[in-house]
C-alpha cells in the first residue's frame, strides 16, 4: 500500500489508530503493528510517513500506559469526544468479534445438522427401542468405498414381544380384563391342532387340588395373622412393664414409717450398750426377745392390712392418725407435731424456704465439748467407733464434732461518701469563648479583645484546678478501697465511680480545647494587626 493513500484521522488517538473509544489493549496493539509496518521509515522513504509514524507511536504509548490512558479518557469525556467515530478508511480495520463473516463450510454444517435432527414420524408401536435398534448404514451415491454387507436382523420390539403369546395355551375364561393384543402382531408360527384332551386335565404336569372339607378349629383367632398380632402385642406389653418391688406393694403410712424407724434406732443403741457393758447371755436373750417382737409386729401388720389400704386411698383428702405404740425406756413421739412439721404427701418440696431459713441464721463457732467426746482407754477400737451416738444422745446434729463450721460470707458495703465523688462537678458551666469581631485598625478594639481573652483564661484555669483536685481525691479513694471495691456488693458503686471520673475528664478536655481555639484565633488577629501597620 502506498503512503499517499494513507489518510489518518487525528481527531483522537483512538481514531488515529482506527479504533473506537474504549478499545481493548489487544486491538490497540494490532492496529499499531499494522500501521507501523506501513509507516516505519525502514519500510517507507517519504517524510510524511515518518511524521505519521511518530504520531502513531505517541498515540500507542499513551493508550498502552494505564495512567496516561485514564487521564486522556477523562479529557475526551470532558470535551464530548468519547462518542466520536471516525468515517475514514482506517476505522474499517476494526471489526468486533460478532461481525465476522460466515463461511460456506459453516453454512453447510448448520444445514446438515438441521437435516439430521429431523426424524420421520412413525406410530408408537413401530418406533424402535431396546436392543438391536441400530440402523444399517446404506451406501451413498458419491462414495466410492464399498460398504460391508451384513445380514439384516430383526430388531427387538418390546410391544410386539409383549403381545406374542403361546397359541397352545388357552386363555383363562374367568379373566375379564381388557387386553392390548392386536391383530397387527400375529405370530408367524403355525397354530397347533386342537387336542382332544378333556379340560379337566389342563394344565399339564400338575396335580389337581384336593378340596378338603373345612374342619372346625379350636383356636379363638380367625387367622394366623390375628394370632401373630395378639402374641406380639402381649410380648411388647410384658416387656414394657417394670418389676414391682415388695416394698411398694406393701401399704404404709406416715405413722408406721416413723414408728418402725424409731424401733430400729432403739435396737441398735441397745445392742451397742450390751456389747460394751453387758454379757453374752444377756445379748442372746435380748436377741430372742427382738425376734419375738419382730414376729408380733409382722402379725400385727398382717392383721391391719385392710386398715392400711383404706388409709392409702384416703391419703389425698386427710392424713391418717394412729396412736403410737408405747415402749418402755424410750421417749414418746408426738405424731401430730411431726405431721404439722413434715411436708404433705404428693406435694413438691420447696427448697427456697430452706435456703431463706439458713440465710437468716447467725451461725457461730462453738467450742468442742471435750468431756462428752472422752472415751475410756479400756474400750476396744471397734467399740469406740460406735460409741459416740450411744453416749451422747442429747447432742444435736448441728454441733460440730471434728470439723470446723465454715465461715459465713459477711457483706461489706462501701458508702458513697468513701468514694470521694463531688456531685457538684456535673453542674459546672464551662466558660464561653469570646468573640473576635473587632477592627484590626483600631487599637482600642484590639485592647478590648485582649481583656476578654484574659478574663476567659482566668475562669478556665480556676475550673481546671477544681477538676484536677476532684480527680486527685478520686485516685486517693481508689487506692484506699483497692481490696473492697472488687467485692460483689460493691461492683455497681465501683462502676458508677468510674463513670464520674470519665465525666470529670471530659469536662477538663473541653476546657483545654476551648483555650486552644481562643489562643489560635487571637494569634491570627494579632498577625493581621501587625501586618496592617496598626502597631
UniProtKB/Swiss-Prot annotation:
Residues 12-76 form the J domain. Its main location: cytoplasm. SMART domains: DnaJ. Keywords: Chaperone, Coiled coil, Cytoplasm, Nucleus. The keyword Mitochondrion does not apply. The keyword Chaperone applies. Residues 112-125, 224-238 have a biased composition (Basic and acidic residues). It holds the Pfam family DnaJ. GO terms for molecular function: Hsp70 protein binding. It comes from the Eukaryota. Residues 446-499 form a coiled coil. This is J protein JJJ2. GO terms for biological process: cellular response to misfolded protein; chaperone cofactor-dependent protein refolding. Residues 135-153, 176-190, 242-256 have a biased composition (Polar residues). It is found in: Cytoplasm; Nucleus. One of its GO terms (cellular component) is endoplasmic reticulum membrane. Residues 87-256, 284-303 are annotated as: Disordered.
